[in-house]
Amino acid sequence: MVKCGKYVLILELLLLTLLYNLIKRVSNSGETVSSFVDGYNWNIMERWKAITPKEKLEYKVNYDLGLDIDAEIGDFGDYNSDVKTDLILFKYDKTTMISTIFVYIFSPSENKFIYHTEAKLEGKIVNLMVIDLNFDGSLDALVLFKDNSSQDKFYISTFIQNENDELEEKFNTKKKETENETISDFEDQNFYFTNIHPLLCDINNDGLPDLIAQHPNKSKSFSRFIWINDGDGGFKSILWENLNIFEYTDISEISNPNSSAIVDLNGDCKADLVFTVINKKNTKRIFLEIWINKIVDGKSLYVKADEDYMLPANSMQILFADFNADGSIDMVVPTCVKSSSCNYCCTSDDKIYFIPNIQTKICENSWTKNEDNKCRLASNLCSESDFEFAKKLSPDYISLLDDKGLHFSGDASYPSYLSVGDVDDDGYLDLLVSLRNDKGQKFVRIYKNEQISNNEQNHTDIRRFYNYYQFISSLEESTPDVYNAAFFDIFENGILDVIIFGTYNSNSKIKKYSSVGFVRSNETDSLFLKSTALNGICVNDCYKEKDKISTKTLGGNAHGPTFKITVIDANGTKSSKIGIQKSQSAHSPLQLPYVLFGLGRTSNYVEEFYVGMPTHEHSYYNMWVSIIPNSHIIVIPYPLDDSNKWQIQLSVNPSNKFYSIIYITLICLSVIGVLIFILDRKEKIEDSKEEMGFKSHFVIG
């Protein structure tokens, strides 16, 4: 009996060893990467191939995603509230002088984007933003367009999604100007157009998106004004100084192009305002004009920073994100020398500046005593902190493009934005960059985020970016002209794919649009957390009081919600990260309608999860604990003025390896169970025989 028990123990150990090796093999599968991935026959857009000099990542071109759309990309959003990100595009017809808006939704059953609806607009669209304009939970469209004149006169038009899922034009400032119809409650404040791309944000705390814009003024060169959302798909204009929520009225002219943003700079989980401006003292450089969202004497105000921050020379479109994963919003600024001979495209000295935000970090351990305010406790993660952007930028802060003759794409007509995303979920945000060389060859590269070694300067984690993965086109005549590229989670699995948007000339020399998707075909061992905040619309109880229950609630596309999380790494060190949902709107930044945090290799929960809404309320944020990684969290901030009643919905998205591990575990456990059952039966039979033999030695009289 004892001998048989030893056999069982030995078999269990052998099977457990086998189980461990199988799981390890499954976990390590998919790490072999081919030297290149061919992408032939990009329809008319010809041949592309993806070259990767590093391990871990593998992208494969996919022609079955329905991306061969003859229209220019405008924005991303969930049009039909199915938790899938859709495409909203537009195209201008020069002959008819009419633009068409197209909506392509992602179909889970077909695994591709399919045509859904379209709408017409008289005029040339220059920017398209999708957001819930009338607070009904459905995704609407806000259009920036111009007439036939060559001047920078940008009008706005709104398209509301009706009950038939179609876009219906509701408001048009060009038509209002033609009809001489007032759009302001104040005399002489009817602003029908702007000379810049406006910033989209909720400025007056009613939960509705407004627009901060600028109007040319003969007496003082410009007037900053706001288009206030009236809640019915329309807007009313008012001068900046008449809104009485800005403590300081001395302002500078917003640059054109601009990369203004609504981001949390001082770490209080409440979004602030940032404008790129032309400073009167130095008109050759671009500055940051910063307005901090504060409560002053019980009243919410935007308080201007003491001085504007001077950006590096020849700066382009700025990116705001937590690039060094320390819980504060940093900047990445691409720069180059431009030439008027090519419509102010980049011709030399292309660089990427990393500018960290220096502020108090989170305490690394929960038992740390914060007596000298040297660190921030996790419970105070949404409290205000002093901040400062680094000013003395040594060569350590600068990344080069690695190749001579390689430049950022884009020009004055289409300023180049870099796309931001964590490609391998290691916790550090990487860049997707559209490039061109002097021969006309087009490149799209992923520049990986890495730490500068042996850096002790200001105790700041300085990052640099290096060429990590490259998508390259052929040198044939029909090579597409790439105008944008973006990270995109096509299958909503927490893995960032890449979509490249371009134009080409058809056989009849007609300019056409198309795009191609590169799907990441392997996984890393790192985890992620995806978070989305709605705009404050009621999702559950309040619809009981209405005659018709709304089935669309996820089309908010809110701009400015702030997310903060804390995680503990394998060494037991606690760190925080911050992310802003839809922080920019000018010049088609192509930001996703959610924040995707890379968590790295951790076996722990997300310790704390904070969300703050861009309101002027005293109660503007809430916190939840112990969030499961590889999850998608949808925050329902209803009501906006009482954060204690906010709710979250969580859906877990396990990786593909999870199912393989489960299957192997079940098989091995079944085998172990069968062996134990067989050996147990054998042992009982032997025991029964021994018992019968023992009884036969006794004679019953």
Swiss-Prot record:
InterPro entries, per the entry: FG-GAP (IPR013517), Integrin_alpha_N (IPR028994), Tip (IPR024881)
Residue ranges, Cytoplasmic side: 679-701
GO cellular component, as recorded: plasma membrane
Membrane topology: Single-pass type I membrane protein
Segment forming the signal sequence: 1-29
Subcellular location: Membrane
Residues carrying sugar: N148, N180, N217, N258, N458, N522, N571
Ranges per topology, Extracellular: 30-657
Keyword annotations of the record: Glycoprotein, Membrane, Signal, Transmembrane, Transmembrane helix
Transmembrane segments: 658-678
Annotated function: May protect the parasite against attack by the host immune system by immunomodulation.
Record-stated family: Belongs to the TIP family.
Protein name per Swiss-Prot or TrEMBL: T-cell immunomodulatory protein homolog
Organism classification: Eukaryota, Sar, Alveolata, Apicomplexa, Aconoidasida
